[in-house]
UniProtKB/Swiss-Prot annotation:
NCBIfam families in alphabetical order: F_box_assoc_1 (TIGR01640)
Ranges annotated as biased composition (Basic and acidic residues): 451-464
Domain F-box: 25-71
Record protein name field: Putative F-box protein At1g46840
InterPro entries listed in its UniProt record: F-box-assoc_dom_typ3, F-box-assoc_interact_dom, F-box-like_dom_sf, F-box_dom
A Pfam family recorded for this sequence: F-box
SMART domains, per database record: FBOX
Species of origin: Arabidopsis thaliana
Source organism, top-level taxon: Eukaryota
Compositional bias annotation for Low complexity: 423-433
């Protein structure tokens, strides 16, 4: 009797599963594919991961390039504010919605993002560009710096190759080229510590082939404002602050597509922060000790036309963490040890401000300065389902001990599909070769391909040995 009941339950599960699959197939057949994409693109990345499990047809649709691009366009209309901070020796990552409606006493729920083991990181820089997070850090007990790119939606983690020469001080900036749809990393290494204006410029492009650093030139000399100098990428141009002859402050402009440098002279001020103001470059200026501030907006990049906005700062806190939203609001987060943690939005046009409490971070936000270490904030963060396609490359490396060239295979993460994401969280593994740590890679179909290639090579070697042995016997 129990056997019959178990069989009946199994048949019921099979029928239910087949019914669900048939229903999902019916929906795809009856509704136009563009309409289905439009509807599903309004869901969150977590909901998309669940929808991928409905059927093979749904999975195929949701990993297509058309859907990934449609989802990104929809995500741009619902930006989020990103928080990265260190609490009790561990790095925490949160994001919360940017409220689009005006009003006071608002509150939003924060979502925690998990990346892996990062307790021993000493973060040097952190940037958010087009849904990807770029981080540069030193591990505990190590002098050389590691650079990684992380997509919180897909959990794809890319470790960038080491710079040559190693163990030198450098600054890196993350940027996106909307024309070619490429991510790039610009790195400036201090060649001569006695001359801080002497830089070696290198660029790395992601998604087009092996991860390799290329040397480029800058036609003018300058000095970066400080090591914590943050850059901002707007419409394919990377901006960051520097000095000429230690007296003139400038904004360095790096065209991500052409990889050409230029600069704009600006007024010296105690606090200068670059912001994205309604898709245009904005310069936030505050004089030390004064509540009044200015925002200069570059309205015309070709003719160098600026517009000026005066305001009274409603919040004197993290001035260096000042950002702007797509609706033209300035953003200041409260001090990390403030309870409750909140964000202040100031509208320049209305000259009004509002406070939004951030919930869900109470147990992770520090309640004392002694437990707080490092804090990064970004506005206009979006969910991006893109997976960067990477490759593996054999790079010759000179072995100074034996004076011979060694072949080091640099392994990089290879996604299961070009647009696999969300629930396709891949397990990473570290590889060592030639005494150096190589980049992470996925354990999946790429490893199966490597096994297949090795078996094919072994079979070819056996055939070659058999042929040679046959010729020897004939002679």
């Amino acid at each position: 009797m129990n056997i019959q009941k178990d069989d009946w339950m199994d048949r019921r599960k099979i029928v239910r599963r087949n019914t669900q699959s048939s229903a999902s197939t019916y929906v795809l057949e009856k509704l136009h594919i563009d309409l289905v994409i439009e509807i599903l693109s309004r869901l969150s990345a977590k909901s998309i991961a669940i929808c991928r499990c409905v059927s093979k047809q749904w999975n195929s649709l949701l990993v297509s390039q058309d859907f990934v691009e449609s989802f990104l366009r929809s995500s741009l209309s619902r930006p989020r504010i990103w928080f990265t901070f260190r609490f009790d020796g561990k790095w925490n990552f949160f994001s919360s919605p940017q409220p689009q409606k005006f009003g006071n006493n608002l509150s939003v729920e924060a979502t925690e993002h998990h990346m892996g083991s990062y307790e021993n990181w000493y973060m040097k820089s952190c940037q958010s560009v087009h849904g990807f997070i770029f981080m540069s850090y030193n591990s505990k007990g190590m002098t050389d710096r590691t650079q990684v790119i992380w997509n919180p939606c897909t959990r794809q983690l890319i470790t960038l190759p080491k710079l040559e020469p190693e163990n030198l001080d450098f600054n890196s900036f993350f940027a996106y080229d909307p024309t070619e749809k490429q991510f790039k990393v610009l790195c400036m290494t201090v060649v001569n510590k006695q001359q801080t204006t002497s830089y070696k410029y290198q660029v790395l492009t992601l998604g087009t082939g092996p991860l390799l650093w290329r040397n480029i030139e800058c036609p003018f000399m300058y000095r970066l404002r400080d090591k914590s100098n943050r850059g901002i990428c707007i419409n394919g141009v990377l901006y960051f602050i520097g000095w000429i002859k230690c007296s003139t402050m400038i904004i360095i402009c790096f065209d991500v597509s052409s990889e050409k440098f230029s600069f704009i002279k600006i007024e010296n001020a105690f606090i200068v922060t670059l912001i994205n103001y309604r898709g245009k470059l904005g310069v936030y200026l505050v004089v030390y000790g004064s509540p009044r501030g200015e925002v200069w907006v570059l309205d015309d990049t070709k003719n160098d036309n600026w517009s000026k906005h005066n305001f009274v700062c409603p919040y004197s806190g993290q001035e260096n963490s000042t950002w702007a939203t797509g609706t033209g609001e300035l953003v200041w987060p409260s001090s990390p040890w403030t309870q409750p943690f909140y964000v202040v939005y100031y509208n320049l046009e209305r000259q009004s401000f509002r406070r939004v409490d951030i919930k869900g971070m109470e147990n992770k936000v520090s309640t004392g300065k002694d437990r707080y270490d490092g804090f990064f904030t970004f506005t206009n963060h979006v969910e991006n389902l893109m997976v960067l396609p990477l490759h593996k490359k054999t790079i010759p490396i000179q072995d100074t001990l034996t004076n011979r060239v060694m072949e080091r295979e640099t392994l990089t993460r290879s996604p299961l599909t070009q647009t696999a994401y969300a629930s396709s969280y891949s397990t990473t593994r570290s590889y060592k070769s030639s005494g150096k740590r190589c980049s992470d890679r996925s354990i999946g179909e790429d490893e199966q391909d490597d096994i297949g290639e090795k078996r094919g090579d072994q079979a070819a070697e056996r055939r070659e040995r058999s042929t040679k042995r046959g010729k020897h016997e004939v002679h």
